[in-house]
């Protein structure tokens, strides 16, 4: 086999990216008014990477998160997971098996304990724990992100904002998703708690191989991610490697409106 043939063969058998957005645009219609919030977005999201999305209000960040999370479909273009268009895969299946979104409002079941919230997520999605019972798996997950058994068995209404955020993360992880998305996850948290949440996101990407995508206005949070995506006027205008020295990064990544 020649080197050219080998290269072609390797390219043909290469695994598709985890998630690809191809020429994605999204338009909202209200009466006679149509507003396009995303315009021709092309990007690939990979496993083991922590992404942040910065941009002014109205730039399309939350819309992008909704499309990546399978909560909506683009007006034009395609969103594909592991080489399959999400509409072909099925949005409900994608959300149940592959992607989970943590919203600004955690949407926890407030009449349940932290532990019950996590086990309920597994029951709803039909997730099977890798070992032991769902309860045991939920306790392990909660412990892995800093919530001990005593905290796990408390009603979520009695937990702090940071603890509730951790429960929301554990609930998403309980279904062993490939992609974890979060919308302004540290906006209402104190600095120490916020940094603890960022530590969890980094661990999920770097130690567990998850793809983590976080919409934020925080430049400090973005500086700890692997890749910073900047949306302006509906276009993905910058892709910044945060491992580069700050002085080498393009301008416009402060995250201010």
Label the predicted regions.
Residues 131-150:
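Conserved ABC ATPase "signature" region
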Residues 77-85:
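Conserved ABC transporter NBD signature motif
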Residues 69:
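Helix-to-loop junction immediately C-terminal to a conserved catalytic motif
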Residues 32, 85-100:
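ABC ATPase NBD coupling module
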Residues 112-121:
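Short coil-to-helix segment of the ABC ATPase nucleotide-binding domain corresponding to the Q-loop/switch region
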Residues 155-159, 163-165:
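Conserved ABC ATPase signature
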Residues 176:
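Conserved catalytic motifs of ABC-family nucleotide-binding domains
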């Amino acid at each position: 086999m020649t080197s050219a043939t080998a290269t072609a063969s390797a390219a043909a058998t290469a695994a598709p990216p985890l998630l690809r957005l191809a020429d994605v645009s999204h338009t909202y219609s209200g009466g006679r008014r149509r507003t396009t919030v995303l315009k021709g977005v092309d990007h690939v999201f990979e496993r083991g990477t922590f992404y942040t999305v910065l941009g002014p209000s109205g730039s399309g960040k939350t819309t992008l998160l909704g499309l990546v999370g399978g909560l909506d479909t683009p007006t034009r273009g395609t969103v594909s997971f592991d080489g399959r268009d999400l509409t072909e895969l099925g949005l409900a299946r994608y959300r149940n098996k592959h992607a989970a979104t943590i919203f600004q409002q955690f949407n926890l079941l407030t009449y349940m304990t932290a532990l019950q919230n996590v086990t309920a997520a597994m029951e709803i999605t039909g997730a099977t724990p890798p070992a032991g019972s769902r309860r045991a798996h939920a306790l392990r997950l909660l412990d892995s992100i800093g919530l001990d058994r005593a905290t796990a068995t408390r009603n979520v209404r009695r937990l702090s904002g940071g603890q509730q955020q951790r429960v929301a993360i554990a609930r998403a992880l309980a279904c062993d998703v490939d992609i974890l998305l979060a919308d302004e996850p540290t906006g209402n948290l104190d600095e120490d708690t916020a940094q603890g949440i960022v530590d969890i996101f980094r661990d999920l990407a770097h130690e567990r191989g998850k793809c983590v995508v976080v919409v934020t206005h925080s430049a400090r949070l973005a500086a700890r991610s692997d890749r910073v995506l900047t949306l302006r006027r509906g276009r993905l205008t910058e892709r910044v490697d945060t491992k580069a020295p700050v002085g080498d990064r393009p301008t416009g990544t402060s995250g201010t409106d």
